[in-house]
Swiss-Prot record:
One of its GO terms (cellular component) is cytoplasm. It is found in: Cytoplasm. Its main location: cytoplasm. It comes from the Bacteria. PANTHER family: 10 KDA HEAT SHOCK PROTEIN, 20 KDA CHAPERONIN, CHLOROPLASTIC. SUPFAM superfamilies: GroES-like (SSF50129). This is Co-chaperonin GroES. Heptamer of 7 subunits arranged in a ring. Interacts with the chaperonin GroEL. GO terms for biological process: chaperone cofactor-dependent protein refolding. Pfam families: Cpn10 (PF00166). Gene3D superfamilies: GroES chaperonin.
Length: 90
């Protein structure tokens, strides 16, 4: 299934980082904070937005923004470009 965001929205896939305590215990998903890093999977019409974002870019976004959806058992978020706080460059 292909999802194309409308307007100045992005489809992002949260980057899950494994969390361990100092003692080496892996925390379950329910004990983790919401991820704030994601990879852009699809972009809407960003002509009016003054941003340089493309598919494959990694970004930091506001913690409780966007709409969470599932596509083929994978978690994604549809988010407004204004809720993107920063672009991560490696």
């Amino acid at each position: 299934m292909k999802v194309i965001p409308l307007g100045s929205r992005l489809l992002i896939k949260p980057i899950q980082e494994e969390k361990r305590t100092e003692g080496g215990i892996v925390l379950p998903d329910t004990a983790k904070e919401k991820p704030m890093k994601a990879e852009i999977v699809a972009v809407g019409n960003l002509e009016d937005a003054d941003v340089d974002l493309h598919v494959g870019d990694k970004v930091i976004f506001s913690k409780y923004s966007g709409t969470e959806i599932k596509i083929e058992e994978e978690d994604y978020i549809i988010i407004d470009v204004e809720d993107i706080l920063a672009k991560i460059e490696d």
